[in-house]
Amino acid sequence: MAKANEIKRGMAISYNGKLLLVRDIDVQSPSARGASTLYKMRFSDVRTGLKVEERFKGDDILDTISLSRRKVNFSYIDGEEYVFMDDEDYTPYIFKKDQIEDELLFIPEAGLPGMQVLTLEGQVLALELPQTVDMEIVDTAPGIKGASASARNKPATMATGLTIQVPEYLSAGDKIRIHIAERRYMSRAD
């Protein structure tokens, strides 16, 4: 059991007889005094795969489910299935393309260290990515000298097809660090 304000992305809860996996959380702080903070959570139903959206107050009690996490690496693609291999015992975990469509935008061709598969009683639930990823810009408008003084942004496309807003001074070929959950530019990568 946990309060709604303690729930994080990637956790699983049991709610209204459904097993739900937290995909995204929006925090809404009301301006009125005495009003409680609302947590708008987007889930995916583990059994049906459908998307579910619910709102909770910060002190609402939710029934959390403990999941097992296994470190994995991307192995290969077999048609519409993506195979990830367990780092320790080499167990293959198979995902259909539509199950992990959003996550695929953040997995470069060389792979992404720190990925985990979430399982419950042997059933594969989701692929969890690390907080950040380093990627190379493949397409953007040319960099403008002296643009570091302004805070304007421009769209940049990565090799995976992901498009995010980056500062004007960056150009194609630059490596950048991206915050995965917020889909935003953080800094240049080392």
UniProtKB/Swiss-Prot annotation:
GO terms for molecular function: translation elongation factor activity. It holds the Pfam family EFP. Transmembrane segments: none annotated. One of its GO terms (cellular component) is cytoplasm. Gene3D superfamilies: 2.30.30.30, Nucleic acid-binding proteins. GO terms for biological process: peptide biosynthetic process. SUPFAM superfamilies: Nucleic acid-binding proteins (SSF50249), Translation proteins SH3-like domain (SSF50104). It comes from the Bacteria. Belongs to the elongation factor P family. This is Elongation factor P-like protein. It comes from Serratia proteamaculans (strain 568).
